[in-house]
């Protein structure tokens, strides 16, 4: 693969199988034209973008959740190399570091890539098998170092797919439709996570079968996504630069000029994800140690909450995504979603009962579903340099990972210091609220 210098290839006389190339652009606004071709997008290709995004997110979230929720933790308990919780925690902690670094690296590399298959497509394709190999090795590794190394390889493969896939929203989707496409992306993640929890639980007595199925899903994730998405334009040119390590190093500089709104979006996203994960990551313990259920009742409650989590996002994107595109606003849906999430967190804080946890699950995922609908669209709209979308979106995606890392650290500290979960709720509410307020200060989008 060759690396290029300068602006991305946008308006190129290359038609391939893209029907929108032949559509007239006269009378269309800039928001209706695809960034890479300067032409309107066809309904067929718009549908293919939606199908590709939702397929990708369902498969990668489902695959990650299938193994990590039940089969892998159960296997770690039988290895005799330490407590399962310690193994799982070490694996995730180090794996997150690789996820953080590789997301930015592959985003930058895809920005600079010059391939006849496009600048994003090759990375998405090769990421799947890398993740699949990493997961399979994790499922058979007998020692902690090999488990950690294998899981880190999975994170590299996963982010090799995520970084360029997210950048497609900026490269190839008209601004007018980004809310709707972001809706598919967000819904796919939530549905995939719920499906993974349900499917993973089914393989508690047949872990090897679950591991093989999960490995296959990982391997097919990238290629399946590429087949569903419209074909990317060639990024190869006669004057493309050969690989230059200095040129690649320059790709990793964080944006500075005109990046105020970009960093506001980063902080807002970090706070919202942090507040959201303070409760989501501890649902079982909250049910047992705060609501007062025994282990069996708590497991049943969490299982029911998973079903609620899967159903709600199926409805939200169909409504809120098109509404966001129609009204042309991103900040208002984020503020509304944050308010709903805050109310959802407050319900079990005030009312300790199983029913309050069900209400929490419904409101949390309603709010989070609305947020995910406009999240990626808002992020794309505040990019300082659209031609460096992969790198910039990779940096924004750090907020997701950091939020998930910081949340358990803070929650654990609160529980150790106070002996309970009571203070976790108001702090989570405050974090979500701060995130919403920060987003309101963005000037570049409405």
Question: Residue locations for each model-derived region?
Answer:
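Helix-to-loop junctions at the C-terminal end of transmembrane segments
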Residues: 103-117, 316-329, 415
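Intracellular juxtamembrane helix-capping segments at the cytosolic ends
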Residues: 72, 160-173, 370-384
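A membrane-interface helix-boundary motif in multi-pass transporters
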Residues: 119-121, 202-217, 412-432
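A late C-terminal transmembrane helix in Major Facilitator Superfamily
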Residues: 387-417
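Glycine-rich segments within core transmembrane alpha-helices of 12-TM secondary carriers
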Residues: 98-99, 179-201, 397-408
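Juxtamembrane intracellular "pre-TM" segments in multi-pass secondary transporters
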Residues: 24-47, 232-267
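Helix-loop boundary and gating motifs at the non-cytosolic
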Residues: 35-96, 261-268, 272-293
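Structural signature of the two symmetry-related core transmembrane helices
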Residues: 120-136, 332-347
